[in-house]
A protein has these predicted regions:
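Stable alpha-helical elements in mature extracytoplasmic
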Residues: 34-35, 47-51, 75-79, 132-136, ...
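Bacterial Sec-dependent N-terminal signal peptides
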Residues: 1-22
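Secreted, luminal/periplasmic, and some membrane-associated catalytic domains
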Residues: 62, 69-71, 93-123, 165, ...
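Loop/turn elements at helix/coil->beta-strand transitions in domains of secreted/extracellular proteins
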Residues: 22-27, 57-61, 87, 145-149, ...
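Beta-strand elements within well-structured catalytic alpha/beta cores of enzymes
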Residues: 23-35, 54, 79, 140, ...
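Short, structured active-site-proximal loop/turn typified by the sulfatase FGly-forming signature C/S-X-P-X-R
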Residues: 40-88, 148-152
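His/Asp/Glu-rich, glycine-adjacent segments
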Residues: 84, 90-275, 284-291, 411-418
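Second-shell loop/turn segments in exported
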Residues: 35-41, 64-66, 122-127, 244-251, ...
Length: 461
């Protein structure tokens, strides 16, 4: 298995164990859409016990993802397997299943049901069935069957793919109930401690609290509105949209994960013996915040300060419960935060949004003119276009020819920097550059027929 460090973007870890000693507990923290420059911008606002401690007491490694499509799930599978998407199989958040003629999400499963919600018996749930290789948790259990593996996230994809195929349980947040749920892939029901934990819906506390700057928490909403500071009425938003999803775009999402993780460490007795355990945590509120706020906004700054507090609280818990020198903590980032056109235009950088929906609508019209009426496109998503191969075969059209025509058409759109076909990716070995990155994300069975990359300063809608 390749080294775990290979695919991480920025990694730091702290451990008091010597090279000859095994840690009793490994804790992985993956933060989505983090902007590293925040550490310089707001470093004075952070405590010495959170991210600064991780950086100072641990080792820091700067490396780059060596594949093209960094997305939720893809990155988590890559981090915890140490392999490329072309190897572990999670090539995208979703792909088109040609045999079943429908879109397949990376962890979606018809074989299992959701557990943790009394009304969820018939709700289809998630599983790591599409993960094609061993992950860190699987390797740990292979070496020591007594090892325990758990993962916690607000999103099911992150929890499932971080834990891997051999996890004792992956736990994620229910947008419907505000409680923690899992899948019958792992067990028939939640453990007693988690069922009891769910009886008090902690998320309601944060919903009713609202979101304001940390320094304003002792002020009323009316007083906050008299200042230039922000206040978000989460309870009103939840009532309007009838979902706990509104919490995911607040720093409270990270806190919910951290608090549950601390409870899990106690109840499952992680790190108490010489059988090393794994706890994979995912902090993903920035995934929902990044397109709503600029990188220098008060909201993003408040998120960073609160994230730092969560990291500090987690490390303090590990010190007290597992003991200094008995655990290893690593922190890494997935899905680097996009610089939005609104940010870049301030410094006169050419930037805009690329609409795949408009592009595909024009592409369909073009293919209709060239090849006649027909549903020539089966699906499209995240820089990939899937052609209707069954129709192409029926009409006795050369697949490579149509792939080339689609590529020639797509490259003409403003904002598109490069286009590649599945034929070129399967018949050519690219040693470097963007072509190599795309090839590392390519699966002959799961990827599309045509791939396109937009300019670095553009953003897909």
């Amino acid at each position: 298995m390749k080294k775990l460090l290979l695919l991480t973007s920025v990694l730091a870890w702290i451990s008091g164990a010597s090279a000859e000693e095994k840690p009793k507990l490994i804790v992985g923290v993956v933060i989505s859409h983090f902007y590293p420059e925040w550490m310089d911008m707001y470093g004075n606002e952070l405590s010495e016990n959170g991210l600064k401690r991780v950086m100072k007491q641990g080792a820091r490694v700067n490396v780059n993802y060596n594949y093209f499509y960094t997305q939720t799930g893809v990155d988590h599978a890559s981090i915890y397997t140490g392999m490329l998407p072309t190897e572990h199989g999670i090539v995208s958040r979703a792909w088109y299943d040609r045999l079943r003629r429908k879109r397949q999400y990376s962890t979606q499963s018809d074989r299992y049901t959701e557990i943790g919600d009394q009304q969820a018996d018939s709700i289809k749930s998630l599983s790591p069935d599409y993960l094609q290789t061993m992950s860190l948790g699987s390797a740990m259990k292979w070496n020591n069957p007594m090892s325990r593996v758990f993962s916690v996230a607000m999103n099911g994809d992150e929890a499932v793919l971080s834990g891997g195929s051999s996890a004792d349980m992956a736990i994620w947040f229910s947008e419907k109930t505000g409680k923690w749920v899992s899948s019958s892939y792992y067990c028939s029901e939640l453990p007693e401690w988690l069922r009891m934990y769910n009886t008090w819906v902690e998320s309601d506390h944060f919903v009713n609290k609202g979101w304001m700057m940390l320094s304003d928490e002792d002020k009323s909403a009316a007083r906050i509105r008299l200042t230039n500071h922000f206040y978000y009425d989460i309870a009103r938003a939840k009532k309007e949209y009838n979902t706990y999803r509104v919490l995911k775009a607040t720093p409270y999402a990270n806190t919910l994960v951290r608090v549950l993780a601390e409870k899990l460490i106690d109840e499952e007795r992680l790190g108490v013996d010489n059988d090393p355990d794994l706890l994979a945590l995912n902090f993903s509120c920035l995934d929902y915040m990044s397109r709503d706020f600029t990188i220098d906004s008060s909201e993003e700054k408040d998120m960073l300060v609160r994230l730092d507090m969560d990291i500090a609280a987690l490390v303090s818990k590990l010190d007290a419960r597992v003991g200094k020198g008995n655990y290893t903590l690593f922190v890494t980032f997935s899905e680097m935060r996009e610089l939005m056109p609104e940010d870049l235009r301030k410094i006169k950088v050419n930037s805009d949004y690329f609409s795949i929906f408009k592009a595909v609508a024009l592409l369909k019209s073009y293919l209709g003119l060239v090849y006649g009426p027909g549903d020539w496109i089966s699906d499209y998503d995240q820089g990939q276009i899937y052609l209707n191969r069954e129709l192409i075969e029926q009409k006795k059209i050369n697949l490579k020819e149509m792939q080339d025509k689609v590529a020639d058409f797509m490259i003409e759109f403003e904002g598109v920097a490069k286009v590649m076909t599945a034929y070129s990716l399967t018949h050519t070995s690219f040693p470097e550059g963007v072509n190599r990155l795309v090839q590392n994300s390519f699966s002959h069975k799961r990827s599309g027929d045509v791939f396109f990359c937009i300019h670095p300063t553009w953003v897909s809608e």
